Swiss-Prot record:
This is Glycine dehydrogenase (decarboxylating). The lineage of its organism: Bacteria, Pseudomonadati, Pseudomonadota, Betaproteobacteria, Neisseriales. Keywords: Oxidoreductase, Pyridoxal phosphate. SUPFAM superfamilies: PLP-dependent transferases. It comes from Neisseria meningitidis serogroup C (strain 053442). The modification N6-(pyridoxal phosphate)lysine is found at residue 698. Gene3D superfamilies: Aspartate Aminotransferase, domain 1, Type I PLP-dependent aspartate aminotransferase-like (Major domain).
Length: 950
C-alpha cells in the first residue's frame, strides 16, 4: 500500500459528480473520452488560453477546519449598534427544522403551486404577520432588504401618485444605508430627493415621502399629523418601521400612511454581517397591481378546495419586461419563512413579552443614566438610548470603555453615543453598560420599570389573532407543523429539479454547516473593521477565486440577487460613461431571447431598449446587431447578453458581438445566469465582456431557499471597477468613495458566502473544471435521449447543446390539444418538478439537469417524459378523451384515488404510471390550482383555520 494513495483530497468532487457514469454517458452521446466530447461541443474560438488558477481541492474535513480558522478571526462582541440590525434568538426548533433542513432550503420559487403548498402557507403566514403589524390589507412575500424596499416604495409612489412632481421627501431620521440606496435609484428615475425635518415635510410639493418609525437615533415621533397634512395634498406616504416596535406601537396604517416597509431580521434571523434578511412591504389594497415582488394569494384547486399560489404575476419582469413594476425575481423566501415561523412559535403574547422586555431594559438604562445626571437625548424611545456627553473626549472614553468590556456601541457624532437594546439583552448587560457610561461599578435597578412610550403612541388593536399564531407554542406541536408543511413540498431532497436557467445543483451538507456558526451569524454589518478580519479574509479568498474563474479585475459582492447584480453591472457602465462625459449614451441593445429582467433593469437605469433579432438557430443575428449598433453609435450605452445563450447554445459569434459593440462606443454586460457552462472552459472577460453578474445561488451552490436568498456579485474590468456600488458606512475596498450603494449592507448577504467558499475549496481547480464538463455531458445525454420523442429546438456545434436544452412541445399540442402546462403538471404524478415552462419560447420545456445528478436519476426523469409522450399520443388517437385523461386532470392527489372513480384511465395509471414511482411516491396535496380565480378574487391573508385541518 502507498500511504499517499490512501488520502483522497478529491473526495468531495466524487460526491458532487457521478464519475462511475462517465463511460455510459459518453457512449450514449457518441464519444470516447471527455476531452473529445468537450472539443466537439464547445467552440474552439471561445476556449480560455490557460488553466484555472485555483488551489488544489481539500477534503470536507480539511476545508471545514480551514474555514473555522478563518471564522475564528471574527470577534463576537455584544452588539448594541442598532441601525436596523439586532442580535436575536433563532428558536432551535426552527433552526434545525427549517434553516438546516434541505426540505426547505433546496426548494425552488413556488411557480408550481401544487407541489409547493407547504412553503406557500409559510409565506402566507409571513404576509399575515406583516398585515397585522402594519395594519394594511395586503403584504408581499418579502423584498431583498429594507433599503431596497424603501427604493421600491419611492418608485411605487411615483407610479400610483397623482401629484405632478419629481420631488420625493426623505425624513432625515432614516437609516443612512437606506438613504444611500435611495440616492442611487432616484438619480436614474429622475427624482429629486429632499432630506429634511420630518415635521416640515408638508412645506413642499412632493409626489411621495418616507418617514422612519423608529428614528435612526431611537426617537419615536407621532407622525399622524404630518402624514395627514401630506395626504391632504395628495402625497403618497411610506413609513419604514421597525418590525419589533410595531408589536407595541400604532400601525403605519393607523398613522395614515399608504405603504409600510422594513426589515424582519429581528424576528429570529441572525445579523450575519448584513444578511440575508427578508424585508417586508405592505400597502393599501388599491396599489396591489403596482407592487414589486411576489405576493402569495389564496385560490382554489380543480376540486374546489382552497389552494395557495403566487398571485398577480402579470406585474412581474418576466411578463412585462421593460414595463415591469420592478426587476426583482428572487427575494428572501427562506428568511421570510424563518420570520413568519418566529411569530407562529412565539404567538402574540410571546412577541409582546420580547418587545416589552427590550423596551423595559432600555428604559431602565435611561432612568439610571438620567439619575446620574447624564443627558439622554430622546425622552420617548423604543429600544435605543442616545446620550450626549457634550464633549468628544468623554464620548471617546465611554465608547472605548464599552469596547473593552466586549460591547459595540454606535457613535452618533463627536459627542453622542447610542446603545440599542435587543432580544438577547440581559440584566447583567445593564450593569456592564452602566459601568462603561458612568465609571461606577454598582447599578441597582428597580424591577418595576416605567416605559418611555406615551400612551397615545401605543396600539390598541390586537395582533396575530389568527389561529395559526395561537396553536403551535409547544415544541412538539411546532415540530409537527413544520414537518406537515415540508411534506407538501417537492424539493431536491426528493428528486432532481431540472429548471432551465436555474442551475438546481447539489447544496452539499458540508457547504451549509458554517452558515450557522456564531462567528459568521452573530456579526453586525457595521461592526468595527478590526472585529471582522475573518469576513475580510473570506471575501479576499473568494474575490481571488472568482477573478480567476471569470478573468475580471475586480469583484463587488454587494448585490443581493441576480437582478440586483444586473442593476449593479449596468449601473457601473452608466457611471463610467458619465465620468467620460458620455451621459448621452442611453441605448441598450437586448437580444429578443433575453430574460425579462434585462429590459426591466435597463429601464430602471433610464435606458431605452432596442431589441436585436435572433436567427433560426436562436443566436443573435449579427447583421441586425451590426446595423443597430451603427445606427445608434453616438448613443449606444451597452448590450446585455446571456452566454451561453438563453436558448442553451454556445454562440460562436460572441467575440464578434463584443467587438461590434465596442467599435460603436458601447460596453458589454454579460448576464451570468448560465455561468455553469463556462468555468474552466472560457472566461467572460477574455471573450470581451466588460462586466458580468454571477448567481452564487446557481453556479456556486447557494441553495434557492424556495425563492431566495440569492447573491449576484459582479465582476468588472479595471476601467469599471471604481464605479461599482459603494456604501455610506463601510469601506468596500473596491468602489471609489463617492459611489452610492445598491443594497443595505456593503457585502450583501455575506453570511451565506461560506457556502460558495466551501464549494470552491472542496472542488479545487480540477473539480471546478470537471463540474462544467459534467454539466455539459448530462445536458447532452438528456437531449440525446429525449430527441427520440421530442424535437430539441436549438443546437449548436455538431448538433450539441450547452448545459441545457429546449424541448419543443408545440407539435404534440397541435396534434392532441395537450398543453405544456398539462405536461408540467403531469410530471408531478411521476415525482418530478417541471422544467422551465414556456421560456424562452412559448410551448416548450427548458431542461437543465446540472452536473450533480446521477445517470440513474436522469434515466428516471427521461423515462417519465417518454411515458408522458405515450400518454399524449393516446389522447391524440382518441383512446382517452381530450377533456378527461391523466394529463388534463394532473396532478392527482391521494383523495382522488381513494374516492369515487369514473375516469377512462385506471387509478394505477393516474398515480403509479411507472414502477419506480411506487418506490418513492410524492403525493401533491392539492389538485391543479385555478390561477384565474386567484387573481380575480385576490386574498393575501391567512384563510380560516378549518382550511388548515388535514
Amino acid at each position: 500500500m502507498k500511504l499517499s494513495e490512501l488520502f483522497n483530497p478529491d473526495e468531495f468532487a466524487a460526491r458532487h459528480l457521478s464519475f462511475g457514469d462517465e463511460a455510459a454517458l459518453l457512449a450514449a452521446v457518441g464519444e470516447k473520452s471527455m476531452d473529445d466530447f468537450v472539443g466537439n461541443t464547445v467552440p474552439q474560438s471561445i476556449r480560455m488560453p490557460s488553466e484555472l488558477d485555483l488551489p488544489e481541492a481539500l477534503t470536507e474535513a480539511d476545508a471545514l477546519a480551514k474555514l473555522k480558522g478563518i471564522a475564528s478571526k471574527n470577534m463576537i462582541n455584544k452588539s448594541y449598534i442598532g441601525l436596523g440590525y439586532y442580535p436575536t434568538r433563532v428558536p432551535n426548533v426552527i433552526l434545525r427544522n427549517v434553516l438546516e433542513n434541505p426540505g426547505w432550503y433546496t426548494a425552488y420559487t413556488p411557480y408550481q403551486a401544487e407541489i409547493a403548498q407547504g412553503r406557500l402557507e409559510a409565506l402566507l403566514n409571513f404576509q399575515q404577520v406583516c398585515i397585522d403589524l402594519t395594519g394594511f390589507p395586503v403584504a408581499g412575500a418579502s423584498l431583498l432588504d429594507e433599503a431596497t424596499a424603501a427604493a421600491e416604495a419611492m418608485a411605487m409612489a411615483h407610479r400610483v401618485g397623482k401629484v405632478k412632481s419629481e420631488r420625493f421627501f426623505v425624513d432625515a431620521r432614516v437609516y443612512p444605508q437606506t438613504l444611500d440606496v435611495m440616492k442611487t435609484r432616484a438619480k436614474y428615475f429622475g427624482f429629486e430627493l429632499v432630506v429634511g425635518d420630518f415635521a416640515q415635510a408638508d412645506e413642499g410639493e412632493y409626489f411621495g415621502a418616507l418617514f422612519q418609525y423608529v428614528g435612526k437615533d431611537g426617537d419615536v415621533q407621532d407622525l399622524q399629523d404630518v402624514i395627514g397634512r401630506l395626504k391632504a395634498k395628495g402625497t403618497i406616504v411610506a413609513v419604514s418601521a421597525d418590525i419589533m416596535s410595531l408589536v407595541l406601537l400604532k400601525s403605519p396604517a393607523e398613522l395614515g400612511a399608504d405603504i409600510a416597509l422594513g426589515n424582519t431580521q429581528r424576528f429570529g434571523v441572525p445579523m450575519g454581517f448584513g444578511g440575508p434578511h427578508a424585508a417586508y412591504f405592505a400597502f393599501k389594497d388599491e396599489f396591489k397591481r403596482s407592487a414589486p415582488g411576489r405576493i402569495i394569494g389564496v385560490s382554489k384547486d380543480a376540486s374546489g378546495k382552497p389552494a395557495l399560489r403566487m398571485a398577480l404575476s402579470t406585474r412581474e419582469q418576466h411578463i412585462r419586461r421593460e414595463k415591469a413594476t420592478s426587476n426583482i425575481c428572487t427575494a428572501q423566501a427562506l428568511l421570510a419563512n424563518l420570520a413568519g415561523m418566529y411569530a407562529v412559535y412565539h404567538g402574540p403574547e410571546g412577541v409582546k413579552r420580547i418587545a416589552n422586555r427590550i423596551h423595559a431594559l432600555a428604559s431602565a438604562f435611561a432612568d439610571a443614566l438620567v439619575s446620574d445626571g447624564i443627558n439622554v437625548v430622546h425622552k420617548v424611545f423604543f429600544d435605543t438610548v442616545t446620550v450626549d456627553f457634550g464633549n468628544k473626549e468623554k464620548a471617546d472614553q465611554v465608547f472605548a470603555a464599552a469596547l473593552e468590556s466586549g460591547y459595540n456601541l454606535r457613535r452618533v457624532n463627536d459627542t453622542q453615543v447610542a446603545a440599542a437594546f435587543h432580544e438577547t439583552s440581559a440584566c447583567e448587560d445593564l450593569v456592564d453598560l452602566y459601568r462603561a457610561f458612568t465609571g461606577k461599578d454598582t447599578f441597582a435597578f428597580a424591577d418595576d420599570v416605567k416605559g418611555r412610550l406615551n400612551a397615545e403612541l401605543l396600539r390598541q388593536d390586537d395582533i396575530l389573532q389568527h389561529p395559526v399564531f395561537n396553536r403551535y407554542h409547544t415544541e412538539h406541536e411546532m415540530l409537527r407543523y413544520l414537518k406537515k408543511l415540508e411534506d407538501r413540498d417537492l424539493a431536491m431532497n426528493r428528486s432532481m429539479i431540472s429548471l432551465g436557467s436555474c442551475t438546481m445543483k447539489l447544496n452539499a451538507t458540508a457547504e451549509m454547516l458554517p452558515i450557522t456558526w456564531a462567528e459568521f451569524s452573530d456579526i453586525h454589518p457595521y461592526a468595527p473593521e478590526a472585529q471582522t478580519a475573518g469576513y475580510r479574509e473570506l471575501l479576499a479568498d473568494m474575490e481571488n477565486s472568482l477573478k480567476s474563474i471569470t478573468g475580471f479585475d475586480a469583484i463587488s459582492f454587494q448585490p443581493n440577487s441576480g437582478a440586483q447584480g444586473e442593476y449593479s453591472g449596468m449601473l457601473a457602465i452608466r457611471r463610467y460613461q458619465e465620468a467620460q462625459g458620455e451621459a448621452q449614451r442611453n441605448i441598450c441593445l437586448i437580444p429578443k431571447s433575453a430574460h425579462g429582467t434585462n429590459p426591466a433593469t435597463a429601464a430602471m437605469l433610464g435606458l431605452k431598449v432596442v431589441v436585436v433579432d435572433t436567427d433560426e438557430h436562436g443566436n443573435v443575428n449579427i447583421d441586425d446587431l451590426k446595423a443597430k449598433a451603427e445606427q445608434h453609435r453616438d448613443a449606444l450605452s451597452a448590450i446585455m447578453i446571456t452566454y451561453p445563450s438563453t436558448h442553451g447554445v454556445y454562440e460562436e459569434g460572441i467575440r464578434d458581438i463584443c467587438r461590434i459593440v465596442h467599435e460603436n462606443g458601447g460596453q458589454v454586460y454579460m448576464d451570468g445566469a448560465n455561468l455553469n457552462a463556462q468555468i474552466g472552459i472560457m472566461q467572460p472577460a477574455e471573450v470581451g465582456a466588460d462586466v458580468l453578474h454571477m448567481n452564487l445561488h446557481k453556479t456556486f451552490c447557494i441553495p434557492h431557499g424556495g425563492g431566495g436568498p440569492g447573491m449576484g456579485p459582479i465582476g468588472l474590468k479595471a476601467h469599471l471597477a471604481p464605479f461599482a456600488p459603494g456604501h455610506a458606512l463601510t469601506d468596500t475596498h473596491s468602489a471609489s468613495a463617492d459611489q452610492t450603494a445598491v443594497a443595505a449592507a456593503a457585502f450583501g448577504s455575506a453570511s451565506i458566502l461560506p457556502i460558495t467558499w466551501m464549494y470552491l475549496t472542496m472542488m479545487g481547480k480540477q473539480g471546478m473544471e470537471q463540474a462544467t464538463r459534467w454539466a455539459l455531458l448530462n445536458a447532452n445525454y438528456v437531449a440525446k435521449r429525449l430527441s427520440e420523442d421530442y424535437p430539441i429546438l436549438y443546437t449548436g456545434k455538431n448538433g450539441r447543446v450547452a448545459h441545457e436544452c429546449i424541448v419543443d412541445l408545440r407539435p404534440l399540442k397541435a396534434e392532441s390539444g395537450i398543453t405544456e402546462t398539462d405536461i408540467a403538471k403531469r410530471l408531478m404524478d411521476y415525482g418530478f418538478h417541471a422544467p422551465t415552462v414556456s421560456f424562452p419560447v412559448a410551448g416548450t420545456l427548458m431542461i437543465e439537469p446540472t452536473e450533480s445528478e446521477s445517470k440513474a436519476e436522469l434515466d428516471r426523469f427521461i423515462a417519465a417524459l417518454k411515458q408522458i409522450k405515450q400518454e399524449v399520443l393516446k389522447v391524440g388517437r382518441g383512446e382517452w378523451p381530450k377533456e378527461d385523461n391523466p394529463l388534463v386532470n394532473a396532478p392527482h392527489t391521494a383523495s382522488d384515488v381513494t374516492g369515487e372513480w369514473a375516469h377512462p384511465y385506471s387509478r394505477e395509471e393516474a398515480v403509479f404510471p411507472l414502477p419506480f414511482v411506487r418506490e418513492h411516491k410524492f403525493w401533491p396535496s392539492v389538485n391543479r390550482v385555478d390561477d384565474v380565480y386567484g387573481d380575480r378574487n385576490l386574498v393575501c391573508s391567512c384563510p380560516p383555520m378549518e382550511n388548515y385541518e388535514d
